Regions:
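Accessory alpha-helical/coil subdomains and C-terminal extensions
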Residues: 1-63
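Conserved mixed alpha/beta catalytic, RNA-binding, or beta-rich assembly cores of soluble enzyme
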Residues: 76-115
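A short beta-alpha structural unit
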Residues: 18-19, 46-54, 79-91, 123-127
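Short glycine/threonine-rich loop-to-helix capping motif typified by GTGT followed
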Residues: 53-63, 69, 88-102, 128-136
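Structural signal for hydrophobic packing residues in well-ordered secondary-structure cores
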Residues: 9, 31-39, 60, 64-71, ...
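Internal helix-turn-beta structural module
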Residues: 105-196, 201-202
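Flexible, glycine/charged-enriched surface loops at secondary-structure junctions
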Residues: 1-8, 38-48, 69-79, 114-121, ...
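Predominant activation on well-ordered alpha-helical scaffold segments within soluble catalytic domains
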Residues: 28-32, 36, 54-61, 65, ...
Length: 202
């Protein structure tokens, strides 16, 4: 060990050309550009999200609720974007991944909100030991789960988000993407969709 420590450190080669061609920051910026082309005002909140997956999901859900009440600075149509990689502390023996768990934890907060959609996906197309990259949930997900007798808190305590989300067709399956620059989370908020929903129900 001492011999290795005392050895000269490698020097930069004069003919070396190092370029970063992909990063989580670039991923978020690309997502922001896509959102903008679809008419959403993008906000990149963080590219280093690294908390407990369930807490991140609840955070996104609370953002949506605050926006719905008109108590946030977000405009009527926006995309709230984050990048990073959350963690899961296992308490059960179910099947799932951090992105699926994040999305499921947001479900109770989004319940009944026709103007909010949350997507959480891995850039490599893999989320935990599953074939899914992540999940997409909205204001109808909670009721659809409840109709099947599936309760979010029970599922989360068993870390079984995969099977619950599979039952309501909320998994995002892309297959391997050939890259890996952490995960992408985006919350789409659109007040106009609420107005359209009210018109249809009138």
């Amino acid at each position: 060990i001492m011999q290795q420590i005392q050895e000269e450190t490698p020097k930069t080669l004069p003919n070396a050309n190092i370029q970063i061609i992909g990063s989580v920051s670039a991923l978020c910026q690309s997502a922001a550009r896509c959102a903008q082309t679809l008419g959403y005002t993008p906000f990149i909140l963080s590219t280093m999200l690294d908390c407990e997956a369930k807490e991140a999901g609840r955070f996104f859900g609370s953002l949506a609720q605050t926006w719905q009440k008109g108590e946030s600075f977000f405009p009527s149509k926006c995309a709230v974007i984050c990048g990073g990689e959350t963690v899961v502390h296992l308490t059960g023996n179910g099947k799932g991944g951090r992105n699926q768990e994040l999305a499921l934890a947001a479900v109770p907060y989004l319940d009944g909100m026709s103007q909010a959609v949350l997507v959480a996906v891995g850039s490599d197309g893999t989320d935990g030991p599953t074939d899914a990259a992540g999940a997409i949930v909205d204001g109808t997900t909670a009721q659809r789960l409840q109709d099947l007798g599936i309760f979010v808190d029970t599922v989360l305590s068993n870390n079984d988000a995969y099977h619950a989300l599979q039952q309501v067709d909320s998994l995002v399956i892309t297959g391997p993407t050939g890259t890996n620059v952490n995960d992408l989370y985006f919350l789409l908020l659109d007040a106009d969709s609420e107005k359209e929903s009210q018109k249809k129900n009138a």
